[in-house]
Structures are given as C-alpha cells and as structure tokens.
C-alpha cells in the first residue's frame, strides 16, 4: 500500500474524521480522549457492518488486530488499515515488527509507550481532540492532531556542538561544514544514543541534533520528558 487514505467513522453520538499518510501511525493521549472508542467502533463495523449503527467510509478495509492469535489473524490481512488498541503486548515484540515490515498493510497503533522496534515518523504521532467543526450538532466531532509540531526557524542557527545520528557520510558531511564555523561535530552511532549524548553536553552549550525524523518516533517519549 502507498499513499494517504481518508477515514470517516461515526454513529449517532460521535464522529471521527482523519487521514492516514504512512504505514505506521501512532495515537497517544490520556484516558477518556476517545482512543479506545475509535478502535471499538472500527471493530464493531468490521464485524456487523451498518447493522451496528456505525458508518465507516474508507477506500480500504479497516479492521482490528488483538489477542494472542494476532499472528494467525495478520497472515490473512492484505492491504488493510489495521487498528490496534492499548493492552496488546505483542506490539513491542520483534516478531510483530518483522511482520509489519513484511506486510502490505497500514497500522494505526494506540500506545502511550515508545515502540523501539518500529521505524515510525515523528510526524505520524497524533492525539485525539474534540473539534468545533460540527458544534451545532449533537454528534461530537473528533479529529487527530500532531503531538509534535514543526518549528520554523527564522533566525540563523549557530550551535556550538552538532550531534549527528550516523557515523558515515552524514557525519562526514556535517563535520566538513561545521569545521569552518569552529563547531564540534560528534556521532551518536545510532538514534538510541542521541539522548545520552545530549545529556553529556554542558547546560550552557548550544546543541543541534540532526536525525532522521521519519524513523525517530519511538524515541520521542524520552525527549518529551526531558
């Protein structure tokens, strides 16, 4: 599967409308924000269709994966958008990560923890919030929002230290640039080591971190507590 897919799921009380853009989407947030309700509605429609009182609009099949038999169930799912609620421990396993990489499905995973085995983007971590778009209706409208937004820099960045994720061509490239500016460049030798390298810096240093945001999502739970 490639591309983005719009999903609308609703009943007489609540409506969710959002777009899935990549193969792994993470939904985070506190209790009572509508995460489990969303997954339950997807599952109810998948099992019972419109007789459930739920309407779902998407060009791809939306389904729910859960329980100890997840692998057998996943083997039968092809080109689907698969929702996984909190409490399914298999999402943390290397076996699940391998199955995701080998499949042609999209995955929407509800979790409050980082999934270190999965390469998901910082830009595909969302929360759920109520929107005033349908404020005149009794139906509550919910939408997804980016938890980690983009920051536009309007001033020149002048770091004293640059921490680069890799130790190969990326490191050599930025080292060559930074040496002209009398700036120290070090390699973290992997995304999981970046946070430790930042902690080793003095509090007065201006530090710039260069990492692949498309695979850095699982590390954000550490950074959000920093």
State where each predicted segment sits.
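Acidic, divalent-metal-binding catalytic cores of TOPRIM
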Residues: 88-89, 122-226
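N-terminal pre-Walker A segment at the start of P-loop NTPase domains
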Residues: 1-16, 136-140
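Post-Walker A alpha-helix
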Residues: 38-40
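Post-Walker A helix-loop "phosphate-sensing" segment adjacent to the P-loop in P-loop NTPases
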Residues: 44-55
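Conserved lysine of the Walker
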Residues: 35
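Structural recognition of the conserved hydrophobic beta-strand(s) that form the central parallel beta-sheet
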Residues: 83-85, 104-114
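Conserved P-loop NTPase "ATPase switch" module shared by AAA+ and STAND
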Residues: 68-94
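The conserved Walker
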Residues: 31
């Amino acid at each position: 599967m490639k591309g983005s897919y719009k999903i609308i799921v609703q009943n007489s009380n609540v409506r969710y409308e959002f777009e899935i853009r990549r193969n792994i989407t993470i939904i985070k947030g506190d209790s009572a924000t509508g995460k489990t309700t969303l997954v339950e509605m997807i599952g109810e429609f998948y099992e019972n269709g419109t007789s459930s009182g739920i309407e779902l609009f998407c060009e791809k099949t939306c389904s729910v994966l859960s329980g100890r038999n997840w692998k057998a169930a996943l083997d039968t799912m092809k080109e689907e958008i698969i929702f996984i609620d909190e409490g399914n421990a298999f999402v943390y396993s290397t076996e699940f990560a391998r199955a995701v990489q080998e499949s042609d499905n999209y995955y929407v995973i509800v979790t409050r923890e980082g999934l270190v085995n999965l390469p998901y983007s910082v830009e595909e971590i969302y929360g759920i919030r109520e929107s005033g778009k349908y404020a005149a209706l009794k139906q509550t409208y919910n939408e997804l929002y980016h938890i980690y937004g983009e920051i536009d820099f309007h001033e020149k960045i002048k770091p004293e230290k640059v921490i680069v994720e890799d130790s190969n061509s990326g490191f050599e490239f930025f080292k060559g640039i930074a040496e002209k500016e009398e700036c120290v460049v070090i390699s973290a030798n992997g995304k999981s080591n970046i946070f430790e390298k930042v902690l080793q810096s003095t509090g007065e240093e201006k530090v710039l971190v260069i990492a692949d945001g498309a695979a850095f999502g699982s590390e954000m739970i550490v950074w959000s507590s920093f």
